[in-house]
C-alpha cells in the first residue's frame, strides 16, 4: 500500500523498489504460487490460495499427509503458515492430523493480529533441505532481468531466521553432492528469470527455494525487496567495465530512479566464494532469546578479504536497544574457493573481540 500511495499522491514521489503492482503480485505467497504453477515452476505441495474455512483447511492438510505417506515419508509433516507472513513469523508444524485444528486456529488468530489478514496456507513440511536463493535485478522496462548468482541460507536459528549465508549456493567443483548440484543451480536460475520476465519485474528481488536431499527444487516465495544478505552475492559478482564487486543497493537506487540496466547477463561474471556471518545479540544457551546489555569492546582485524557492515561503535560502549532487530553486524568474507573462504572465516572469528555485560552485570 505504501509503494502505491507515494506514486499516486498529488505530489508524486519515487519509490525505490519494485512497482506496487509487482509487489502486489509477487509479495503475496498465494499469487506467487499460482503464477509459478502456471509456468510449470515446481512449488511445495499444498494450497495455492489463502484458506479461511477450518473444514476446508483440514481437508487439504489431510490430503497433504496422505501424499507424503504415498511418497514413503516415514514422518509426514504439514506446515501451517500465515499467508501474509514472512521472515519466519506465523509458521507452525503439525505432526498429527488430530492436532491440526488447534494449530490452524492459533495461526489464524496470529495472522489477524499481526497482518490484519487471517488467511492461512497449508503446505507439506519438507525436512532435511537446503535453502537457496537467486538474486535478480531488472530495470523499469521489466524486459531484461539478469541474475547475480545464488546463495545458500540453510544455517538458520530456531526461529527460521538466517545466520550464515554462502555464495554461490552450491560449489559442485569443490564438494560432492548426492544429486546434480550444477543442474539444480541452472534450473532455479532459469525458473526465477522466467517468472521475472512474465511479470515484468522492475527492480531488485530474491527468489527463495527449497532443495531436497534428492535434489528436487521447490519455490517458496519471492521477496520483492533488497535483502540483508545481498552483500554476499555482490561480493562474488562483477559487471564488465565496472570496477570492483557490484553494489546491489546502488543498483537498486539507480534503477529506481529510472536509469536503464545498461548491461546484460553476458556482462556479469562471478569469482570465488563468499561467506556472510551475522553477528546477533542472542543467547544460545537460552533458546536464542535476545541478549540485552552493554557492549564494552568491539574490534576485529582488518583484512583485504573482509567487509564489515555495522552500526555498533568501536570507540565507545554501546547499549543494545530492545526496540530493534538484534543484528549487530554483517561480516562478509571472500576466498578464491570454499576452503579458503572457510579458513579466512575462522581466522576472522579468532580475531574478533566482542565483550560486554548483560543487564544483570554478567560478562
Residue ranges and their predicted role:
Residues 2, 31-32, 57, 192:
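Residues within well-ordered alpha-helices
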Residues 33-37, 61, 122:
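Structural element of the ATP-grasp superfamily
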Residues 49-56, 127-129:
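Short acidic loop-to-helix transition motifs that present clustered carboxylates
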Residues 56-71:
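Short amphipathic alpha-helix with an adjacent loop that forms part of the alpha/beta core around
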